Amino acid sequence: MRPPAFWAAGPDHPAARGLGPLGAVYGALAARRMDRPGARAGCPVLCLGNFTLGGAGKTPAALAVAALVAELGAAPAFLSRGYGGRLAGPVRVDPAHHAAAEVGDEPLLLARRAPAVVARDRPAGAALCRSLGADVIVMDDGLQNPSLAKDLSLAVVDGPAGLGNGLPFPAGPLRAPLARQWPHVGGLIVIGNGAGGDAVARAAERRGLPVHGARLVREADDLAGRRCLAFAGIGRPEKFYATLAEAGAVIVGTRPYPDHHPYRARELAALAEAARRLDAELVTTEKDAVRLPRAFAAGVRVLRVRLAFDDAEALRRQIRGALGAP
């Protein structure tokens, strides 16, 4: 789903006002659901979620938090719903055998770093994580899902995008009214700079919540000066295009697709033909690459990024406290 343009406009936009009553009902139901008590996993649970629908950087944040957990001497495992995959789980993700159509794209990325479990039933997924030897569970998404109790929930916010018009879906991008989400959050991770993210950070600080600034950092690449046709099926493809431009790539065309888009053969053929016509290389994201057939992916460049925190030690201290570590 591509977010409608009016989500980024003010709350007085005619479409937002027209959908306001429906958003109020949806938001009230979502908020009531969030307040339900969850089952205990038997080990600490850290949740990387977001206030809004769409991409904010939860998966890079989950990877970075899991790395900090491992540095503290714990054994993390990832737990995901597996959005876009057909398997209900619980199942351990095996990148050598599973496809994105089965388990979703993000779990395939997570499973490269630590055991990853896909489960629509989060408590059952947590039990499988424990059986795999995990003593800390890192949830990729699930802030609004109450079925599993969390020891620390960090809301990931895209700095440039912020929270849009601040209204609940479908009038805006919020998954529930913001005032009802704050009590479930223990801190923020704000990725990138922007007025929207700054406003959310100030609201968090007024509530005494820690705010962790972060940025996406490119892994080593040799894209400078290369003609690139960029394609991506992610929440905010413009972030990907901007990162490519920062790498010095010459972007001769872009092809945005919906988030989690399953690429069809005719679409891939059209991409290959467009790249040939433009005398360009195809470039995409890691998340898109795992959704491509292996033979096609072999001819596509992948831009790899990681999340770097402005003050990793501050986040490490907060995680240590959530784990009950000395």
From Swiss-Prot:
Pfam hit, one:
LpxK
Q: Which GO terms describe its biological process?
A: lipid A biosynthetic process; lipopolysaccharide core region biosynthetic process
> Could you give one GO CC term from the UniProt record?
plasma membrane
**Taxonomic superkingdom:** Bacteria
Q: Is Mitochondrion set as a keyword in this record? A: no
Top enzyme category: transferase
Q: Which pathway does UniProt place it in?
A: Glycolipid biosynthesis; lipid IV(A) biosynthesis; lipid IV(A) from (3R)-3-hydroxytetradecanoyl-[acyl-carrier-protein] and UDP-N-acetyl-alpha-D-glucosamine: step 6/6
As its record notes, the protein acts as a catalyst of: a lipid A disaccharide + ATP = a lipid IVA + ADP + H(+)
The residues that the entry says bind ATP are T52, L53, G54, G55, A56, G57, K58, T59
Which stretches are transmembrane?
none
Keywords from the named record: ATP-binding, Kinase, Lipid A biosynthesis, Lipid biosynthesis, Lipid metabolism, Nucleotide-binding, Transferase
Give the EC number: 2.7.1.130
Among the GO molecular function terms of this UniProt record, one is: tetraacyldisaccharide 4'-kinase activity
UniProt function note? Transfers the gamma-phosphate of ATP to the 4'-position of a tetraacyldisaccharide 1-phosphate intermediate (termed DS-1-P) to form tetraacyldisaccharide 1,4'-bis-phosphate (lipid IVA).
Q: Give the family per the record.
A: Belongs to the LpxK family.
The molecule here is called Tetraacyldisaccharide 4'-kinase
Task: Please report the organism this UniProt entry assigns to the protein.
Answer: Methylobacterium radiotolerans (strain ATCC 27329 / DSM 1819 / JCM 2831 / NBRC 15690 / NCIMB 10815 / 0-1)
